[in-house]
Amino acid sequence: MTSPLTLSQRALALKTDSTLTLNTQGQLGVSLTPGDGLVLNTNGLSINADPQTLAFNNSGALEVNLDPDGPWSKTATGIDLRLDPTTLEVDNWELGVKLDPDEAIDSGPDGLCLNLDETLLLATNSTSGKTELGVHLNTSGPITADDQGIDLDVDPNTMQVNTGPSGGMLAVKLKSGGGLTADPDGISVTATVAPPSISATAPLTYTSGTIALTTDTQTMQVNSNQLAVKLKTGGGLTADADGISVSVAPTPTISASPPLTYTNGQIGLSIGDQSLQVSSGQLQVKLKSQGGIQQSTQGLGVAVDQTLKIVSNTLEVNTDPSGPLTSGNNGLSLAAVTPLAVSSAGVTLNYQSPLTVTSNSLGLSIAAPLQAGAQGLTVNTMEPLSASAQGIQLHYGQGFQVVAGTLQLLTNPPIVVSSRGFTLLYTPAFTVSNNMLGLNVDGTDCVAISSAGLQIRKEAPLYVTSGSTPALALKYSSDFTITNGALALANSGGGGSSTPEVATYHCGDNLLESYDIFASLPNTNAAKVAAYCRLAAAGGVVSGTIQVTSYAGRWPKVGNSVTDGIKFAIVVSPPMDKDPRSNLSQWLGATVFPAGATTALFSPNPYGSLNTITTLPSIASDWYVPESNLVTYTKIHFKPTGSQQLQLASGELVVAAAKSPVQTTKYELIYLGFTLKQNSSGTNFFDPNASSDLSFLTPPIPFTYLGYYQ
């Protein structure tokens, strides 16, 4: 006979590795890891895929299911998000609005914003409550703004706005008949003095920005900055504190015309009390303290700040040469660069989709999956996608992992993933023909393949039973008996067989080379370990040892072993030959000696205590129970070893009697919970960047408990 069939001392046997298993009915099957995405149904082995997110294409390959009407697309390098290149871009793995760096629109932590200089500002409209763009005005200056536009506040008593060829013109308000006139040369005082021997016209002049009083040098003079009538010595006129008087008779007749007056022998000047005044005997223009007109030794002028200037005796708005405001023949204008534009209606923003303007506010027209909120632009996501401050995140469960930003499927041998897809690793006992996996059968051996399936060539005393489930059977006489599935000589003593008082039980791989034992982890994940358990029952007391090893490539990359430890649990099920569902850790068939011993001898004893059995969770792949939740247990300390980088310090094993809701027999199970502790400078066993060859090994850990007996 050749591999994989062997002939042992008792029967024909089929050798398998960890990818195949034999059930209690002796049927060959594929060994599957619960929760790894592979399921076995009536049609054969298949991948259990979520139909909403995963699908099989026409070639039978597994791919991500994408909505054809959505923004996602498939490329040769993976899944991509289709973007409008004119408005959206991806920068450093983040989706954002594409902005022209030369334009006034910018982005910040709160969203899109406008870059403004000191002449513009953003303010909240007290009526609508919306933020609006406006011109920045000095609150202490005369320039104001309302719903009609920018305005210049003036003193209505001294200033007025006249209509000019290109719009309004600021001018000094002159009272009709007030003694002041204006012409292209400026403001002047008009006065007619007509005494019998004196006549004067236009005594006021305005030259080079200075108001002066032109006097007749023969009749008027200025003494100590005071205007006075020039009296000729011996001319018949005298002057004293009371005024001018004629010193000769008869008194001449003196008359005066406005703005000059003559009363009781005194000549006076009638002035408007709102625009002129006499101070210290001098005629002056009356200036309002905040009226915008100032007086100096050079004369009367307009007071201006940095926003106004006087050029060629003309008041102009002072604009920044590097700013957007300019002045010309048509008045003040605002220069704008794209996307801003200036028209008769005001400053407008040129925009195109997806930008919109609603109720005088700039907005962004968006479509699903984007939405706008108080915090800015966000992306609506559906499971398994979610959005956070760090970006869009893909949530994935068991069977997936993310390496270097790429979603990958986790596989366990014999399935591996390469750049070409999934690959099934198989031993020479298998072959692939026409893309189908089959057994590699030696035609000269006792196993043959026909159109009906796999067949075994047999000779007496072997035969195949009839019925709905045919099986290979052995014909034997009454001199033999079958005990625990093994052929044995019938008891010739006539008294019948009895359960041995001493028996041994062992399961697993004593060489610790087969990583096929299922271990449950605290974080709802699972791992594969190699383990060997040996039990010895004598007089109702069971003594056992358990040894476990594994390496990082068999574990999910979740958590921090340096701070939390390497924690896992396995379950030993002595009654698994009668109750396969109780075999939570998926041990291969156990060996019991002697052949007549019952496996019940090795189950924990439920008698003699009350409520000491811990009930495990009913989830097939998640039955880890923390130490604090165990009803009662025994704790054993041990010293593990392993890779130097891990710096393993100590280990603990808790042993507890347990039951699983999925088991069908009454016998208890043995719950073994492990905790491996590291020094603080050790390497995290779960670090995705750590070597997958990091490993640990426990010593054979002894434990004892009371066995099942009555």
Curated annotation (Swiss-Prot):
One of its GO terms (biological process) is symbiont entry into host cell. One of its GO terms (cellular component) is viral capsid. The keyword Ribosomal protein does not apply. Gene3D superfamilies: 6.20.10.20, Fiber protein 1, C-terminal domain, reovirus attachment protein sigma1, domain 1. Keywords: Capsid protein, Host nucleus, Host-virus interaction, Late protein, Viral attachment to host adhesion receptor, Viral attachment to host cell, Virion, Virus entry into host cell. It comes from the Viruses. It holds the Pfam family AdHead_fibreRBD. Its main location: virion. The keyword tRNA-binding does not apply. It is found in: Virion; Host nucleus. All late proteins expressed from the major late promoter are produced by alternative splicing and alternative polyadenylation of the same gene giving rise to non-overlapping ORFs. A leader sequence is present in the N-terminus of all these mRNAs and is recognized by the viral shutoff protein to provide expression although conventional translation via ribosome scanning from the cap has been shut off in the host cell. The tail region anchors the fiber to penton base capsomers, whereas the shaft, built from several repeated motifs, allows the knob to protrude from the virion. Forms spikes that protrude from each vertex of the icosahedral capsid. Interacts with host receptor to provide virion initial attachment to target cell. Fiber proteins are shed during virus entry, when virus is still at the cell surface. This is Fiber protein 1. It comes from Fowl adenovirus A serotype 1 (strain CELO / Phelps).
